Amino acid sequence: MSSEDEDQVQQHTPESEPEWWDQPGMPWNEKPTKADYWCLGWFGFVGIFGLAMIPLRAWLLGLDPPIMLALTGSRIGAASTGALASVGEAQHWLLYLLIGSIVAIKFDWIYWWAGKLWGRGILDVQAQNSKRAAKNIARVEQWAIKLGWLGIFLAYVPIPLPIAFVVFVLMGMTEMPLWKFLVLDFISKTLWSLGYFALGWWIGEPVVYVLEQYARVANWIAIGLVVVIFIGAMRRQRK
């Protein structure tokens, strides 16, 4: 075969296609291990859990506020309990609040783990969904890096940005020990719950109404974030 024929064969030889795990939009940068699959599976579980809880929202809102606070750790539960405590109708409220803090952070370790396993990969997956998502993530990441571990205490700011998601992932990226992350996360959540409790104590029913309206939006944003990450990764894996 002449050199000219060899050149023609090389020109027509298709380049080897990248492996499925190396496709754009996957959180990992190498062939996934069992840990990667487990972490991705936990993301799927969180999404399913969040969707399953939606029909229970009306039931939860109808519970005695301290019980709702202990079961969910929600802002509404904390504020409602504060309103009751101000008139002496919520004994042992601190115990309910502390239990609620533990319940509220039960899945946060998954985001820390994703950051430890995949680094910015998990942020890039979410940023690819839209220009707005990419802009919001970049904005949060910028100030979160400057704050370092103190960013955990701003993770629960009630604004429609993926603050907790980005901050928790960054804590995993920076190799913060899991025990330290969970302790700081628990303290942060407890302080914020005490803040909502105080608002309920001082203001009463109006602050509860405002938090209810915010929760309607925030819950859907949080669930949508997890579902998009899980479904996007699974669809690309099948390809």
Which stretches of residues belong to each language-model region?
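Hydrophobic transmembrane-helix microenvironments that flank and shape a buried ionizable site
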Residues: 70-72, 104-105, 186
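Transmembrane alpha-helical segments of integral membrane proteins
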Residues: 194-206
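Hydrophobic cores of alpha-helical transmembrane segments in multi-pass inner/ER membrane proteins
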Residues: 79-83, 224-230
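Hydrophobic alpha-helical transmembrane bundles that constitute the permease/transmembrane domains
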Residues: 162-166, 186-194
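Membrane-interface alpha-helices at helix entry/exit sites of multi-pass transporters
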Residues: 90-99, 132, 173-190
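Membrane-interfacial helix-loop-helix
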Residues: 1-64, 88-160, 204-221, 232-239
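Transmembrane helix boundary and interhelical junction motifs in multipass membrane proteins
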Residues: 56-91, 159-170
